[in-house]
């Protein structure tokens, strides 16, 4: 029996584990990906006290800090469900079950799919969701980034180190990047923005090579590319808790209060899976610490 089981090993989960360890709680972290989505980030430049650090390096530091405490255990396991058992919780993974007095859900988010013809067919064969992971395959190639968020802008900027030409295709008037990233995009001689345009299909033979657009660009509704990176946001991984009765908002995010508490006693949540206003690693880390302390207070009340 663990005092706290933490589902997820990103900044929220690892920060929760670190603080739970400081509080001498018997802690289990269950994660399918140590470090979470920050491991796909090239440079993190908004972590206080560190001007710039690679996502993988920060993830490693967070993990090592958590494991400094002997009460913390990290297991590589995919969680498939969480259920109540009397006053405790049972966490089911693909390889076994674990029981804990409290749970911190920090499972983060999954990539959002476009849901258009060809996307699934060419996944991994010209269709990608992580520039840092797969961009090096496109040295001196022409690629497209679909999306208009700050994340899409950063994906395009990462890809400039390999690709010779990058199209950012966005369905609205102007991409919504942070000013510092928008400035870099607009100054790049490799990046071209196609606004007010949707991609309706991805075509190819053995590999994706053509995007079908809903309006003409340079006289054609077909855009030839060597690959495409889709960055249209992420969806929370809350399917895990459908049996617990945790309240979600209209976006499927876990509703928490300032203490990272949910409506279910003993069940806490932190990070991008919650309804927090600002989805950033540093915010997730803060929520993780809050959730761990709230779990401690809950356990003290007995």
Each language-model region and where it sits:
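FAD-site-proximal beta/loop scaffold in flavoenzymes
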Residues: 110, 115, 121-137, 232-280, ...
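Nucleotide donor/acceptor-binding cores
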Residues: 2, 25-26, 101-102, 125, ...
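Glycine/small-residue-rich loop that forms an oxyanion/phosphate-binding "nest" at active or ligand-binding sites
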Residues: 75-137
